[in-house]
Amino acid sequence: APGQDFMRF
């Protein structure tokens, strides 16, 4: 989802 790159774990 756009803007959720910090949730890639």
From Swiss-Prot:
One biological process term in Gene Ontology: neuropeptide signaling pathway
Modified residues (Phenylalanine amide): F9
Lineage top rank: taxon: Eukaryota
GO cellular component: extracellular region
Keyword Signal: no
Keywords on record: Amidation, Neuropeptide, Secreted
Tissue localization of expression: In larvae, expressed in the CNS and thoracic perisymapthetic organs (tPSO) but not in the ring gland or abdominal perisymapthetic organs (aPSO) (at protein level). In adults, expressed in brain and thoracic-abdominal ganglion but not in corpora cardiaca and corpora allata (at protein level).
Principal subcellular localization: secreted
Tagged with keyword Cell membrane: no
Localization per Swiss-Prot or TrEMBL: Secreted
UniProt record similarity statement: Belongs to the FARP (FMRFamide related peptide) family.
Function comment: FMRFamides and FMRFamide-like peptides are neuropeptides.
Name of this chain's protein: FMRFamide-like neuropeptide APGQDFMRF-amide
UniProt lineage: Eukaryota, Metazoa, Ecdysozoa, Arthropoda, Hexapoda
